[in-house]
Amino acid sequence: MSWLLKKWQNFIVLAPLASLAFASLSGALFSASVWWALGLLGLALLLSRPDWKWRMLVVCLVVCVAWRTEVIESRVGKSHGQSGSEFVEGTLTLGRVDAVFESQRSGRLEMNSGEVRKVMVMRASEYRAGEILEVRGKLFSPGILRNPDEFSMLDYWKNKSIERGLSIVVAESRGLRWQSAPVRWAERLKLRLQEGVSAGLENDLVGQSVIQAMVLGEKPPADSEISVAFRESGAMHVFAVSGLHVTLVGAIAWMVLMNLPVPRRVGVVVVLLAMVSYAMVTGARPPAVRATLMATCFLGAFVLRRRPSLFNALALSFVLAVIWDPTQVKQIGFQLSYGVLMAIGAGVGVAYRFTGKFAEVDSFFPLRLLDVWQQRWLAVRRYFAALGATSIVAWLGSFPFMLWHFGIVTPISVLASLALIPLTTVILGLAFAGSFLGVFWPELGMLSNRLNGAIARTAYYTADGFASVPMGHWKARRGSGTDWVVFDPADGGAASYLDVGGGVMIDVGSEKFYRYTLRSILRKWGAEVSMLALSHPDGDHVGGAHLLMQQGDLRKAIIPTMKARSPSYRDFISGAEDHGCKILVGTRGKRYQLGGDVWLEVIREGLSEDRGIADNRIMVMRVHWKGWRVLLLGDLGLEDELALLEGEYDLAADVILLGRHHHGNSINMPFLKVTGAKAVITSAANYPPFEKPPQNWIQTMERNGIEIFNQTETGAVLMDFGENDLELRAFLKEEKKLILER
């Protein structure tokens, strides 16, 4: 016990600022959870020096950060609480390009009414940082989430303290702010670097993509083979610009300065300037900014002739970051940055006791007797021993965050980092060298870039190899939390996910819906879709099918017809064989097993002849789930509805899913009486008008005892199937719920 107390006292002496870090965290969380805040305040007081002045500083810091958090959150929350949009006029001062959505810029809008708003400006790539504009435009807030686990632009803006979005209608330039000159310089330099690091790599798309991502943060699409390889090898911290890259840039600068007659303190300042410049050039991404701040706090001790302390430097950077913006403590990247560095600081010494055995030398052997090559080999072993220890504790530190937020576990990343971090260092160094040489000697610059391209390809193949190692990574499948999710694309399209078998989709929505909404939802769930059924070749229903297929998990697709005019539909069919997806044209009466006691039945085949529009070629399907029947009608029209009534079709159903026919006539009361359905889920959109269910149609259905789930009001609809009951729930309206019983 006395040993533990002594360690505690030593930690307080070595890292007195740790108490202030916990105090600032307490203040940032006060509005979210009082109990967590009080617990952290108690820990801060325990870690503080036994001095009433120090403890008073802790309490004051908690109060100040809590007040600042409340001011920021209340202002942003009040602004986003305003529904709809409004036209405004005023003076707009533009900020930097957004790190994720590069066509957008932050800005400060001073409206003619006297109000001031921090805004995100849409389609602002043509403007410059610090540009002052007289504008007329539309202020708006992002729409509410209509589907479970959908990416929230509203939360993204809140985390950046953005109050509203701004679409500019008319703009007139009034000049530039001189204070923003460094940002403009960084943006121009980034454009030059993009050209410089890619010169001579026009025919090497893999090498070019890897270099652009590692050096400038210009990542390829998330579903590309390159991104998947680095993600599944646990090496995204190497692939995307992060704090690691800022650190490596500082290390490269220091290696150059070691060969020059530069005093140590001056060298440290130059290293910090290099890190700050790199962070700005890459868009001041939060991980890069945090790493630069941490490095400044740590290396600043050398400039001030003080003994550096890792924990003290981390604590100081944490306090400064939280005071600047308390809301960022809720961001995943912020938690990862400090969590990993805390783990490294606490555990790297322990880990090195094991990895350091690789670099051990007999303690009785004089090192001065080693020749040059033996000394170099020893230095290499020590480097990899230290890197291995760091990789182990970094992975352990990131493990809970990655599992909780992303549902992926990548133990192979420990080994992957040993190979990829040295390669990344070389790629960064050659990229800067190639860009510099290209200014004076273009041919030599291109030669350097081609060499770099070969190394970048090696990095990709290395990551791909580690990603292929059995049990090197696995996804903790969290699922949708419900049996059937009827998504709301809000554009008149349709998409459903059935959590059965290897995962089943019935329609996938438009390409836009899949790319910007559905893909991220499925990835968050850890869902691997192995089977797909398509109702008809309408772009709003099948537009994302070829993108889903490119994920590589799709093994079977049931389609209405082999021929259609839809380009996305044709792309899907033509690429199926290359992606290992078996195409089956739905056959009337045939049952397709989905998994367990769930199967799909084709009621009516899709029509092969072209009848003008895709809505006239519907394949009518029915899903049987534990004895419950769900009839899928797609955008069935009046003509086909009458044909089904006149034909010998079994249309019995408990629930019906339907859309709106292009000509506006979809499903009437006689048809519904034949089915015996008790609930109808209808897709909807405000535009075009025919996609919106008529109010008189809804009233007629409800008067006849049919529960309508109008997705304009409900958003997504969730269904859970039991042996004796079937529950339907609206995502947007928690109070709207229906339970069907046998």
Question: What residues fall within each predicted segment?
Answer:
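Core dinuclear metal-dependent hydrolase active-site scaffold
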Residues: K219, V322-K330, A463-M531, E577-A652, ...
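Hydrophobic alpha-helical transmembrane segments in multi-pass membrane proteins
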Residues: S2, S19, S31, D51-V58, ...
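Aromatic-rich juxtamembrane segments at the membrane interface
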Residues: S2-L14, F22, N159-M294, L299-G300, ...
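C-terminal regulatory/interaction regions
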Residues: S2-L17, A379-R382, T424, L428-L430, ...
